Amino acid sequence: NAIADYRTFPLISPLASAASFASGVSVTWADGRVSPFHNLWLRDNCPCGDCVYEVTREQVFLVADVPEDIQVQAVTIGDDGRLVVQWDDGHASAYHPGWLRAHAYDAQSLAEREAARPHKHRWMQGLSLPVYDHGAVMQDDDTLLEWLLAVRDVGLTQLHGVPTEPGALIPLAKRISFIRESNFGVLFDVRSKADADSNAYTAFNLPLHTDLPTRELQPGLQFLHCLVNDATGGNSTFVDGFAIAEALRIEAPAAYRLLCETPVEFRNKDRHSDYRCTAPVIALDSSGEVREIRLANFLRAPFQMDAQRMPDYYLAYRRFIQMTREPRFCFTRRLEAGQLWCFDNRRVLHARDAFDPASGDRHFQGCYVDRDELLSRILVLQR
């Protein structure tokens, strides 16, 4: 199926036999596994040049253009090991056994793929922080991939040896993909400002939060690059929001459900912009796993919900906030010049201790890259 994909699929087991049934084809593999494939599924995934444009490797065939009761006229295993299907409308399809096995949807194949799916490594105070050298990440794709896998699975990483010139962050972020611009710019400077338009641009304590919860899609990755940090105070604290959500689910399941099921509004009220988004603090994916944490108390609108739910929701919200402060979850470090944080902003909450701007200069630069770009880059590097 090379024409339909840029990846290659190893031959785990050859096809031993194939037979049609009323609505599809059943194949038996040499290792004994049996996989059914339905007619519409097979026709929908035909990789031939008439069904897939070989230049873009994108499908041009539409399954709605064939009868829903399309039938197999003949099925064989070709000399090259492919599954060959002759359709009753005269079309022919051939499927590479490696591709077919990788996409089989019998119960055993689905279970294998679920077990091999990347899983988040939840962490607490004792995190063994993944640390990488900036030069190696910039020059070596294997190191780049190792770093990106840590960002994906752990959610918090640090780089050393980053040049301390303003803008040095841009080439690093672009090793992944393009930078996501916001109303704070392509790059944003984190330092104390007299006319601050965000609490981040002050010197006082910044509580644990995710950035831009006011957006429909929060930025996936956040970079914070230290150019100079001579001020007293200003340590960084991180917590794994997924670990806290799991602890809350076990310790207070009713509170967990409220934070998953109840949407609340977040607002960013600037002099020149007004961003608003309504979403739950804890978002789940289709399998019930935590997909996203959305929390910044200083960007939260007054709660609006049924009066009977309000008291319990406040208890749940307070419980989550209190858990972010518990030492068992908190990982605290000071970032020095030439070092950089890269973390999953939709999972990891970050905070900053107050600092004394009169004691020395403190200048960070930051930017965002969407999580989709991270996952795409990983898949390309793994080809």
Swiss-Prot record:
GO BP, sorted A to Z: carnitine biosynthetic process
Enzyme class: oxidoreductase
Annotated residues for binding of Zn(2+): C46, C48, C51, H91
Pfam families reported for this sequence: GBBH-like_N, TauD
Catalytic reaction(s) noted: 4-(trimethylamino)butanoate + 2-oxoglutarate + O2 = carnitine + succinate + CO2
Gene Ontology cellular-component annotations: cytoplasm
Pathway this chain belongs to: Amine and polyamine biosynthesis; carnitine biosynthesis
Cofactor binding, note field: Binds 1 Fe(2+) ion per subunit.
Family classification: Belongs to the gamma-BBH/TMLD family.
Subunit-structure text: Homodimer.
Protein name, UniProt field: Gamma-butyrobetaine dioxygenase
